[in-house]
Amino acid sequence: MEGKAAVTTSTEHGDGEASRTAARTVVSGSSRGGAASRALSVADLILRVVAVVAIVDSAIAMGTTNQTLPFFTQFLRFKAQYSDLPTLTLFVVANSAVTAYLVLSIPLSVVHIIRSRASYSRLVLIFLDSVMLALVAAVASASAAIVYLAHKGNVRANWFAVCQQFDSFCERISGPLIGSFAAMAVLLLLVLLSAAALARR
């Protein structure tokens, strides 16, 4: 009887140790998962700030682009500005809209740092980030085509390269495209980060 009691006690002790070990393993795994999700959320916040800077610079640079050329007399001048081209106007409007969205999404990104296991809000961000990525890609690509025509023209369509006269204007409208394409890359990274954070849950 005493032997059976000893065996029973030993078995119960072993079961208790196994349960505690399993519990510690679960807690440890949960802690590591939470730390990884929090790190992804911090990276998300930093990338959103970077995207805001890139988009704002692009919109401001494009929106303030103009050049005036004197023609024969000081009273007759040729002027070129971004609003003369509807595609570049759309570029400024779209970049402004994306900037507003990114600024509004920053508080939600901060919430994800505090509550790393939030999932519904991450799904919303993935959807909206994807929409903004598509918008930026569309306007940046269309604007790049217009800038190319401004530099090279199209002989078959009788479109002349205006950059031969408005060289400063063309330099100014080329620069914002770099920031816009950089913002595209950042938005793509944001979508991937949110997807990775959801996959770790």
UniProtKB/Swiss-Prot annotation:
It comes from the Eukaryota. Residues 63-87, 144-172 are extracellular. GO terms for cellular component: plasma membrane. The chain crosses the membrane at residues 42-62, 88-108, 123-143, 173-193. It is a multi-pass membrane protein. Coiled coil: none annotated. InterPro entries: CASP/CASPL (IPR006459), CASP_dom (IPR006702), CASPL (IPR044173). Its main location: membrane. It is found in: Cell membrane. This is Casparian strip membrane protein 4.
